[in-house]
Amino acid sequence: MVDTKTPGDKTLTMPTKTLTLKPRVEQGVVRQSFSHGRSKQVVVEKRGKRRLGGDEPAAPAAPEVAKKPAPAPAAPPRQQQSRPAPQQSRSGMVLRTLTEDERTARATALADARVREIEERKQAEIEAQRRAEQEKIEKAEREAAEARRKAEEERHRQEDEAKRKAETEAKKRFGDAEPAKKPAETSTTTTTAAPARPATTTTRTPTPAGRPPAVAAEAGDDDEAPRMIRRPGGPARPAPPPKQPAAKPGASKQRGRLTVVTALNADDVRERSIASFRRRTQRLKGHASNEPKEKLVREVVIPEVIAIQELANRMSERAVDVIRLLMKQGAMHKITDVIDADTAQLIAEELGHTVKRVAASDVEEGLFDVVDDSTDTEPRSPVVTVMGHVDHGKTSLLDALRHANVVSGEAGGITQHIGAYQVTSPESGKKITFIDTPGHAAFTAMRARGAKVTDIVVLVVAADDGVMPQTIEAINHAKAAGVPIIVAINKIDKPDAKPDRVRTDLLQHNVQVESMGGDVVDVEVSAKNKINLDKLLEMIALQAEILELKTNTQRPAEGTVIEAKLDRGRGPVATVLVQRGTLRVGDIIVAGAEMGRVRALISDQGETVQEAGPSVPVEVLGFNGPPEAGDRLAVVENEARARQITDYRAHQKREKSAASVSGMRGSLEQMMTQLKTSGRKEFPLIVKADVQGSLEAILGSLEKLGTDEVAARILHAGVGGISESDVTLAEGFNAVILGFSVRANKEAAAAAKRNGIEIRYYNIIYDLVDDIKKAMSGLLAPTLRETMLGNAQILEIFNISKVGKVAGCRVTDGTVERGANVRLIRDNVVVHEGKLSTLKRFKDEVKEVVAGQECGMAFENYTDMRAGDIIECYRVETIQRSL
């Protein structure tokens, strides 16, 4: 095909020249058929093959085909008709309608085409190198195959030669008839095979111009004769035809081929058939099933204990695999068994998962001890705890500071409740919070709580009494809490007051006052006459300045429950000392295993307030139940968090009580204790008190009364009045109900009277402890004391008909009394213990016989007496024991 170029044609240049496609010389239209009856017309361009003159011997025949009249005139009209078309499109339709965007797009396409051309050239070079290497390898293989073929032919030739020699000898033997026939067959075969060899060199007839190339190729293939292959020593066989792709009709050969017309016609798009889509889906499914699934790494949350089945579910693993790993570690388990967190972590990490350890106590994280920013802190009032021995004047000193009278309100004139008050210093005007603690031995826990929440401890010591046991205990509490001590030597107005003796006694307990060269401040005061009270307040304020007490008032409140009780009209009431933040009405609070919402705040003066800042003692109303004294109080953000914390604490409390009651898996010491207490008598009690602190002190005192033989068994202890349920419980165990500063309601009193249940009321803890001690002493077994009366020696045994055997004895020591206990000793061995049934002297019954006299004795239910035995006479006394 020859391309001609007119002067109007433009070459491909950038950026003004456009990229156009020159039409082929021959064009045709073919209708394509698709599935479901669809079809469309496609313009087909026919390209002629360029043939070189030296390649094929059929080249001289080309002019003869060109001289034929049929195809010659048909070619020029097609060229004349096809040439003006590009000129018209270039002159009138392409260049005049091109926009700047189209020019830019075509320039971009041209640049991309150049890049692709460079890449294709590189790929072609690489492919050429690869083909050269492949041809070299194939050539070596062909040479090796040719060498093998020649060796094989040589071997066959030698075999044929040997056969021919054998046949020649056979012909000579059997005659000339068969040898004559054999050459004829051989010549016939040779003649038949001879024309087959030139057939391989026959050439195909050139394709006429008017016939499609596909049809010409088919005709040429049909005209070729089969090529014959002849091997040495064997008949000629037709060679297999070369493998060629199956020829298709001209129209179907262009089917699916992307041409310019097809690409520009966007409306007619070939669609995938449903069967093709199904095959593709099946193929993708097959590939997906054959590919190995990637293992998912999960974050496994592991609590303190977890069941094997639950662990497997959280890891999305099989429980069998988990048990197999445990077996490798030497542990045999079932899927329902529970394992600890460490073992579960090892299993999860072995299986390639990440572990997140959690504990039930995590609900309390961030509840307390949150560090405050130093820029948000403000000074706060000091908290001062007054401690000392009973009757040393602690409450009287506070009354003098507060200008109030609290002592008269306490039963017996002693403090049995812990109280918190605020006092304003007359000189500085600053407030000081005082906490009063009981002094007697029963309230050790109260004193310990007071020392924990305080900043300064005021140790009150009576000048006339000196250092006492509870004074020493208060010193130990203050040292354990790490708070400074101020010694207040009280009752200096008494004539027998000796302040110097108090200072000297304190040295024995590592409390060195300033007058003795130490750093502990001491002040001589008198609560009764109000002497040096202002100096005491001044020393407290000075110590508070040294401590630099600051806190953040805008944060959620934290505090400590000092006292708790169950009020009949107000419900659970807790006395709380706010330590950090500000407690407001409506806050959701948690203290121990109890929660609630603050309904009211009552100050120490009995006034209702809306908020309480740091170091302020208030009564809090709104708890669900009375908390325990000493519990820490905190404000939480919502009720859900508060419920989580209280549920966890209640669960912990139940577990502790269950473990103490069951005693299972206890230590050896616990087992020995249970053996000791197995035969111990119990005194059942039900204790009800007004406040939690008093109840705690009573229970501690009753526990100390117990011995190895008898102990108090507390069936129930609580805060509040005596109810009918308490009476019902006491009836089942025949228990005594103790009420401390509380009374039974009408129904409970009637039920107790009807069922014969004893209810005892007390206001002073000493009286309660003394009465219970006496009652428990009645359960103790009495002590038996043996008193020796005298000894007698048996001289002779007499048989009396009505009495039986009677021993004639002489009293050698002391006296022998009738009815006394006797012990028969033979050869220094006690053979009988009993009582004297008869004591006679000269046929008369007597009450006693003194030493040196002779008498007759008979034993109760015993007659085996011999001469020479010794009789000991003694008296047994019963002595009642007490705790």
Swiss-Prot record:
Region (G5): 526-528
Signal peptide (from-to): none
Listed Gene3D superfamilies: P-loop containing nucleotide triphosphate hydrolases, Translation factors, Translation initiation factor IF- 2, domain 3
The tr-type G domain, residue ranges: 379-548
Region (G4): 490-493
Binding, GTP: 388-395, 436-440, 490-493
Positions of region (G2): 413-417
Claim: Secreted is one of the keywords in the record: no
Chain spans, region G1: 388-395
One Gene Ontology term, aspect cellular component: cytosol
Function: One of the essential components for the initiation of protein synthesis. Protects formylmethionyl-tRNA from spontaneous hydrolysis and promotes its binding to the 30S ribosomal subunits. Also involved in the hydrolysis of GTP during the formation of the 70S ribosomal complex.
Protein name: Translation initiation factor IF-2
Gene source species: Rhodopseudomonas palustris (strain ATCC BAA-98 / CGA009)
